[in-house]
């Protein structure tokens, strides 16, 4: 049995074919809030406590409270550069396979890192030479994220299925809300090679990513997404496997890998 309690607005349960039940919501310029209760038995009105929806929008308790620490091995200057070695916590209590796939930085210097298996970690460096790194798991369950960009201090992740924007609603260091910021029907390919790469922005706030056209039903291309995530367009097509998208002041650069008789094509979009 289906019970319906309308908390705000107008709605009712109407019967459908084969015993189905539909909820008909009356047109209204305001939001409609309702509670649906289900019972396996025939009852006059399924009961139960109504949970305030706002309580579900404030963020929940941390799921991954353990903070990991790894070492930094300072590099020796070599022809003007010193390459430090940042240790990755390959052994971790969550069994997370730490294959780093993308990274970007917050304004305070913290680093957001994604892994191919679908995690996002926040990495904080301790002050001073040789300071340790503190790793905190921020999100999990994303679909092979190969691009990450911090915009307005919010982590945006380019997975195989969409751009996801991550919100920490209660400031406890973990994402509570995984917002589907942008998705298109052409983005997912069944092939094992249908990868979607990178995530960059231009000065106007547009996003860019590239997608493989090799052994894939996707169009090998560079895609431009509007700052609000609502519109997208191809700005470069007929690319084989353009893994390597960079942003410079004059535009976007792409490197397309050659193979066999394929011709290397790198180009800049001004």
Q: PLM ranges: what are they?
A:
Residues 43, 48-270:
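Beta-propeller domains with acidic blade repeats across secreted/periplasmic ectodomains
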Residues 3-65:
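Extended acidic/polar, glycine-enriched regions
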Residues 1-2, 8-10, 17-22, 27-34, ...:
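Generic structural motif recognizing short loop/turn segments at the entrances and edges of beta-strands
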């Amino acid at each position: 049995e289906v019970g319906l309690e309308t908390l705000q607005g107008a709605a009712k349960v109407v019967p459908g074919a084969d015993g189905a039940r539909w909820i008909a919501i009356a047109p209204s310029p305001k939001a409609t809030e309702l509670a649906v209760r289900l019972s396996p038995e025939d009852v006059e009105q399924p009961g139960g406590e109504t949970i305030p929806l706002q309580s579900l929008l404030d963020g929940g308790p941390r799921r991954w409270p353990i903070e990991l620490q790894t070492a930094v091995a300072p590099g020796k200057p070599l022809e003007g550069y010193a390459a430090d070695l940042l240790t990755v916590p390959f052994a971790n209590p969550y069994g997370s396979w730490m294959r780093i796939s993308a990274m970007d930085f917050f304004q305070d210097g913290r680093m957001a890192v994604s892994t191919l298996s679908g995690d996002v970690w926040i990495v904080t460096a301790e002050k001073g030479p040789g300071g340790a790194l503190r790793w905190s798991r921020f999100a999990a369950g994303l679909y092979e994220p190969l691009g990450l960009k911090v915009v307005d201090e919010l982590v945006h992740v380019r997975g195989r299925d969409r751009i996801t924007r991550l919100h920490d609603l209660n400031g406890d260091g973990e994402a509570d809300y995984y917002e589907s910021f942008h998705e298109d029907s052409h983005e997912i390919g069944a092939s094992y090679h249908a990868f979607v790469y990178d995530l960059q922005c231009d000065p106007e706030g547009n996003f860019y990513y590239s997608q493989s056209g090799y052994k894939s039903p996707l169009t090998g291309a560079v895609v431009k997404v509007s700052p609000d995530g609502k519109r997208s367009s191809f700005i470069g097509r007929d690319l084989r496997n353009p893994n390597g998208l960079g942003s410079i002041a004059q535009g976007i650069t792409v490197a397309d890998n050659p193979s066999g008789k394929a011709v290397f094509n790198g180009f800049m979009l001004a």
